[in-house]
Swiss-Prot record:
Signal sequence coordinates: 1-30
Catalytic reactions of this protein: Random endo-hydrolysis of N-acetyl-beta-D-glucosaminide (1->4)-beta-linkages in chitin and chitodextrins
Source taxon at top rank: Bacteria
Gene Ontology CC annotations of this record: extracellular region
CDD domains membership: ChiA1_BD (cd12214), FN3 (cd00063), GH18_chitinase_D-like (cd02871)
PROSITE patterns according to UniProt: FN3, GH18_1, GH18_2
Annotated catalytic residues: 303 (proton donor)
Assigned keywords, A-Z: Carbohydrate metabolism, Chitin degradation, Glycosidase, Hydrolase, Polysaccharide degradation, Signal
Native source organism of the sequence: Niallia circulans (Bacillus circulans)
Ranges for domain Fibronectin type-III: 95-180
The protein's name in its UniProt record: Chitinase D
Domain GH18: 190-514
Hydrolase keyword on record: yes
Record-stated family: Belongs to the glycosyl hydrolase 18 family. Chitinase class II subfamily.
Length: 524
């Protein structure tokens, strides 16, 4: 018998068996389920809620960073969990609703709308002005700048998903810009803000009137409680009589400077735990201090346990922690008492502001209810970009203090806004650019960490204000920048003098150069 004929059935059966095994065998490259705590690299495939995603940026997954929630980290690639050809997504998101405006100035407007929904996930929104695309954002708010005073504009918003599907335009909104701004402050368009020590810590002992003329705003540090737990604050000049100090303040004011009393500091624990006695002590004592010396306003520099959220206080829009509620009401009373020209600033640490992006509770985000409630009263917010370590930006990446990327990422969180306590949390709306300055140490000796060389800081400011990229890791969500961003705060004037004013000598000319550009001018 012919051997070829003899063994053909066996070969045919074996081949059929192999084909069957091949056909039903699971794919080796099937996407694994997404899991928090797993380190993912670029190109990794995962499945989440029966949808496949590809990692586009290396990271370690955290709860709240699910692929559908973080388009900066994951790209949707199709339906199904077991491989095969993905089903194309052709369904557009729903139309954005509830488009409203707020914080309208002569050159800018803040727009807010309700979130759209999508069968896979909304990745962003396009903002149109008079039919022209002017901004892209991944949040439900946008600050449109570069507008003309006294002009009416028509805005619409469209939602988009990862597949590029675009919703229909929202209902149009007409906004008319104002004819000018009334936010009080120095007449210069870019400010240098410094803290002056009312104590001797080995840096430099300076008479208040001898502060470098490079500074626009001088925060006298500090008014502190007269005893632990008291709501009464006190201030006594340490190197001058009361009359001499009043004369020094008047002298600086004659030069166009603003001189504020700063309350708190690292050692000044202020906790207004009751709405009657302590809050009244707080208001009365600050009214007396401000009136006695002729200060232009108040700087809030509360640290440590002075601001901390109680358990169960979960929404910055309606805080329940007594010492936070009482602080808000007390400051509002001071603003009302002294009137529209009262200058109000704040210098929180990053944990108390940007730290609320991922976690909201205890100290994390504890300043947010204060900033939110006072946003229409606040002249300037200069978060301390030092003594903080690394912080996470809007792109989900961690940035180290003392770098241009850190300054850009932290500033943009306030310029763009962010969800508090995770991607599903309530949205903290952005402040105006002219309400934002960057806080840095004046020298290596001034802080435990975060000192930034002048060239590095100016690199960050050129990107933030003019949109001039330095090729860093963080990418601005508004490529043109924020021309109205106000300037630089430093701790401190005394530490600057310790190094022969190297800090102010480097940054004053730089800020003057920025001031020649068109900005959202603040007139006092």
């Amino acid at each position: 018998m012919n051997q070829a004929v003899r063994f053909r059935p066996v070969i045919t059966f074996a081949l059929a068996f192999i084909l069957i095994i091949t056909w039903f065998a699971p794919r080796a490259d099937a996407a694994a389920q997404w899991q928090a705590g797993t380190a993912y690299k670029q190109g990794d495939l995962v499945t989440y809620l029966n949808k496949d995603y590809e990692c586009i940026q290396p990271h370690t997954a955290l709860t709240g960073w699910e692929p559908s929630n973080v388009p900066a980290l994951w790209k949707y690639v199709g339906e199904g969990t077991g491989g095969g050809t993905p089903t194309p997504d052709t369904t557009p998101p729903t139309v954005p609703a509830g488009l409203t405006s707020s914080l309208v100035t002569d050159t800018s407007v803040n727009l807010t709308w309700n979130a759209s929904t999508d069968n896979v996930g909304v990745t962003g929104y396009e903002v149109y002005r008079n039919g022209t695309l002017v901004a892209n954002t991944s949040t439900t708010t946008a600050v449109v700048t570069g507008l003309t005073a006294g002009t009416t504009y028509v805005f619409t918003v469209k939602a988009k998903d990862a597949a590029g599907n675009l919703s229909a335009a929202s209902t149009s909104l007409s906004v008319t810009t104002s004819t000018g701004s009334s936010n009080p402050g120095p007449s210069g368009s870019k400010w240098l803000i410094g803290y002056w020590h009312n104590f001797d810590n080995g840096s430099t002992n300076i008479k208040l009137r001898n502060v470098s003329t490079a500074y626009d705003v001088i925060n006298v540090s500090f008014a502190e409680p007269i005893s632990p737990g008291s709501g009464t604050l006190a201030f006594t000049p340490y190197n001058a009589t009361v009359e001499e100090f009043k004369s020094d303040i008047a002298y600086l004011q004659s030069q166009g400077k603003k001189v504020l009393i700063s309350m708190g500091g690292a050692n000044g624990r202020i906790e207004l735990t009751d709405a009657t006695k302590k809050r009244q002590q707080f208001e009365d004592s600050l009214k007396s201090i401000i009136s006695t010396y002729g200060f232009n306003g108040l700087d809030i520099d509360l640290e440590g346990s002075s601001l901390s959220l109680n358990a169960g206080d979960t929404d910055f829009r309606s805080p329940t922690t007594p010492k936070i509620v009482n602080l808000i009401n007390g400051v509002k009373a001071l603003k009302s008492h002294f009137g529209a020209n009262f200058v109000l600033t704040a210098a929180p640490e990053t944990a108390y502001v940007q730290g609320g992006y991922l976690n909201y509770g205890g100290p994390w985000g504890a300043y947010l209810p204060v900033i939110h409630a006072l946003r229409n009263d606040l002249t300037l917010l200069h978060v301390q970009h030092y003594n903080t370590g690394s912080m996470v930006g809007l792109d989900g990446r961690s940035y180290a203090q003392g770098t241009a990327d850190f300054h850009v990422a932290m500033a943009q969180m306030l310029l763009q806004g962010f969800n508090v306590g995770g991607s599903s949390g309530p949205f903290f709306s952005p402040l105006r650019p002219d309400q934002i300055a960057i806080g840095v140490p004046a020298s290596q000796q001034a802080a435990g960490g975060g000192y930034t060389a002048p060239a590095e800081l100016q690199k960050a400011l050129n990107y933030l204000i003019k949109g001039v990229s330095y090729g860093g890791s963080y990418t601005l969500r508004q490529p043109a920048g924020y021309v109205g961003l106000k300037g630089i705060m430093t701790w401190s004037i005394n530490w600057d003098a310790y190094t022969n004013n190297q800090f102010s000598n480097a940054h004053r000319p730089f800020l003057n150069g920025l001031s020649t550009q068109k900005t959202e001018e603040v007139v006092y």
